[in-house]
């Protein structure tokens, strides 16, 4: 509350209303987006993984993998669009998805996944349970924040 006085020495109490277009949470999110240029750390990314089947023959396995990923507390979706593999990889890379999970015959036969990280063009094959254990640990927020 502000106080002001008149020429007759009367004291008036004034109130000021403050209104901001964005609150502190919105400003914080804006700073995060600007700082990371959309490439969020894995633990804070809104969509952490996209599972991409190589063809329609592997869609069931891709759905199974995505469900297991979600059960481990990692956000995931399956890309079932009717596009070729390179288009899907490019599309999700531009969307800055941290991990792309590729599923094909080799992965189905060995109960594994092929991982492609956003910051690398290299692909890594991992057994599914090892993948879940490793990335569940990465999904926890750092304790030094």
Which stretches of residues belong to each language-model region?
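Amphipathic beta-strand/beta-sheet edge segments enriched in Tyr/Trp
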Residues: 107-123
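A short alpha->beta transition loop at the rim of the catalytic pocket in nucleotide-sugar-dependent
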Residues: 96
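Cofactor-cradling patches in redox/metallo enzymes
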Residues: 93
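C-terminal interaction segment
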Residues: 123-145
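Generic long, charged, amphipathic alpha-helical segments
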Residues: 36-90
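Conserved phosphate/anionic-ligand binding catalytic regions in large, soluble enzymes, centered on
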Residues: 15-32
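Single conserved hydrophobic/aromatic residue that forms the stacking wall/gate
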Residues: 1-8, 12
